[in-house]
């Protein structure tokens, strides 16, 4: 297992500056958040030259571009909107391939909760669109990671993958805090995502021992199944980017040390 951070932790940094920060604190990957005007340039509008340059910078630094995290989801009842999102996701798959980024995060929330089969229908619709996207992603050597986020709990993400018939390029981004915030404990959530976790987001705060203990348990469960992906720090526009990176890097070292005991 490896540790990364999202560009939202350092929203004013270029690729070169992100790489310097990663090296300073011992991070092995960087997750690029497009669409938020970060100066890293990993965007759909990036030229072939920019894409090639990013790929070369990451390779030279021996730090992985581990994920691209756009705001793409297929939970809309308007299928025309889903069609537009699918076309956009296809473009992100090309961007990921061009920058040697093996994962793309996608959303699946908010889920409808109005009865009359709306949630079940939404599962099926998301599975349909994600299956189409996963077929394209597989051709490009990219994995799509449906994030456990908001009302998309572990049980919900697991159901979408089940209805999609588990395509090889469709995985889960297990952001544990969203499970805990919606009444789904660690081991309960794990039963629904086991064997299909391709990526994980995490964040902790100073003194939040409960959060640290939950993260340590999540890491223990994933280590037990041989997970070799990234735990990526998601913190949006913190007041002190360097301190945030340092704190999470230290927490990650403690977690790895605990796994070795």
Regions found by a protein language model. Give the residues of each.
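Hydrophobic faces of well-ordered beta-strands that scaffold small-molecule active sites
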Residues: 3-7, 30-32, 65-70, 104-106, ...
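Active-site acidic/histidine proton-transfer and metal-coordination neighborhood
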Residues: 16-17, 52, 57-64, 74-172, ...
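Short, acidic/polar
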Residues: 11-22, 81-94, 182-191, 214-218
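Glycine-rich, proline-tolerant flexible connector loops at the mouths of alpha/beta enzymes
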Residues: 31-55, 109-115
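Gly/Pro-rich active-site loop or hairpin
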Residues: 19, 39-45, 117, 178-230, ...
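Active-site-proximal loop/turn and secondary-structure-junction residues that shape catalytic pockets
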Residues: 9-11, 34-36, 72-74, 108-113, ...
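C-terminal helical cap(s) of enzyme catalytic domains, especially alpha/beta-barrels
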Residues: 242-261
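Catalytic domains of carbohydrate-active enzymes, especially glycoside hydrolases
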Residues: 16-35, 100
